[in-house]
Amino acid sequence: MSTTSTVTRLLQRQIMPIDRDTDVFPLYVDLEEAKLDTDRHAVGGDKAAKDLNNAAIRQSTSTGKKLHPDQIRSRTALELRPSQPLSFGTYFNAFPASYWRRHTVVTDVDLTVEVVGAGSVVTVYKSMARGHAQRVDSATVEGEGQDARGSFSFSLPLKPFVDGGWYWYDVVAGDHGATVEGAAWTAQVPADRAEHGTVDVCITTMLPDMSAQLLGQLGDAEELQPYLDTVMVMDQGKDKVTDSSYFPAAEAGLGDKLRVIVQGNLGGSGGYARGQLESVRKGTATYAMMMDDDVVCEPEGIIRAVTFGDLAKRPTIVGGHMFNLFSRAELHSFGEIVQPWRFWRLRVP
């Protein structure tokens, strides 16, 4: 029996979009039925049958269900109409179990969901590497009326996720509606991993307004501040970020965590190399994160990257995804590989 001391750490929490932007709702909640791959035994082993099934999934149309921005009650809370079903099996609210199993010291996770509204049902699911889903557990809010409250905890092992898969939860509101006040994925980790690390965010820019707006986003995120050591801007443009009309607000938000470094135009690689050099010289942050300047940042992504790095089995490069700025729920690529003999990147098949 192990005598190693452990502590509870938050891995990720339920979040809603900061600005209630309807374009990004699909990244946080899903109002449609899950369109996962049909079980191979139902489709058959014939290639033509598989292709036909995959085409049917791609061509399936939306039911037209909508979520009103006013249903987002806070950064972590969401209101459901009476009898409304809703899934949190989404990019930001599902839990990437297979990645945590493979790359971190975490072996089991606990999901806690806080729901208000009698008769509301929480159901936990998992997906497998082939894409089909399995129901894991469920719970119902007992009592009467819209003020009835339920706090449900589910212990979920990561052992089944050898070759892929996610955990997530769905909620169906009762007759009086429901409010999903929050949810948290936590784990017991070794005591020497109790404290979270900090990060230097390194931004190379020639776009003063866009980079200043990004700095403002980082400074406005109160929950992010304990994780930030320094935000370094390598300013390589003719027009300076400090001259942007957005800069005073950004400077006020970040305070002494902000550092602007003016240098010649050395390209992206030269800018990020300078950021890494300054981070190593300073030596006060656990990690250095390279970030584009022309992006809208979800601050929770930085927190989750730091948390994943803290709990990795070995020192690990933690990558982040990028979405289309003009079609904000469109993911450019879920993963990439580098061919070492030609140093050329490709999307993972």
What does each model-identified segment do?
Residues L218-I261:
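Acidic donor-binding segment of Leloir-type glycosyltransferases
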Residues S279-A285, A312:
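Glycine-rich phosphate-binding loop signature in dinucleotide/nucleotide-binding domains
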Residues G283-V296:
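Short beta-strand-to-loop acidic/aromatic patch adjacent to the donor-nucleotide binding site
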Residues Q59, D70-S74, L78-L80, F88-A118, ...:
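N-proximal low-complexity "stem/linker" segments adjacent to membrane-targeting elements
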Residues A252-G255, G267-S269, F343-P349:
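Active-site-adjacent "gating/activation" loops or surface patches in catalytic cores
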Residues V296-L346:
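Conserved donor NDP-sugar-binding/catalytic core segment of glycosyltransferases
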Residues M1-D110:
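Long, charged/polar, low-complexity intrinsically disordered N-terminal extensions
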Residues Q263-S279:
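Glycine-rich, basic loop-to-helix element that forms the pyrophosphate-binding segment
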